[in-house]
């Protein structure tokens, strides 16, 4: 296996734009940078494969309803890969992220955040879920948010939770 730039593990990233427009949406290179930063900080050292699907409100709502029982579009959904039983070797597949573009844009506007920064935060947040991080309990939330803050700071992005608290 050939190492990628800076000896980072190989990343097989598929970005699917399933919206009627692409103007203003992050390019694949941005997604790659955000995913790579989250994988490194989240402790993932091997090759990784995942998909990021950018969707409209209708698909975001349908998926949120079908998988979480909530009848509205949400910003990001994470679908971790589940290996088939009896598999001896780990696979690089981590899972899929679904990000609802109109929700991201609305939230960024409402929170007074640059859209690109909010996209980065949601990608990092989703990747950490794929790596097994969660925020159901207060201690888990504190640890996950702290890691998100560090990753985003490394990308030159302000603390998203500080902005939420203002």
Curated annotation (Swiss-Prot):
**Cofactor-binding details, from the entry:** Binds 1 zinc ion.
Q: Name one GO cellular component term.
A: cytoplasm
Q: What class of enzyme is it?
A: hydrolase
- List of residues binding Zn(2+): 125, 129, 135
Q: Which SUPFAM superfamilies match?
A: Metalloproteases ('zincins'), catalytic domain
User: Per its UniProt record, what InterPro entries does this chain match?
Assistant: MetalPrtase_cat_dom_sf_prd, YbeY, YbeY_CS
Domain of life assignment: Bacteria
GO biological process terms, semicolon-separated: rRNA processing
Q: Which UniProt keywords apply?
A: Cytoplasm, Endonuclease, Hydrolase, Metal-binding, Nuclease, Ribosome biogenesis, rRNA processing, Zinc
Family statement drawn from the similarity comment of this UniProt entry: Belongs to the endoribonuclease YbeY family.
Protein name as catalogued: Endoribonuclease YbeY
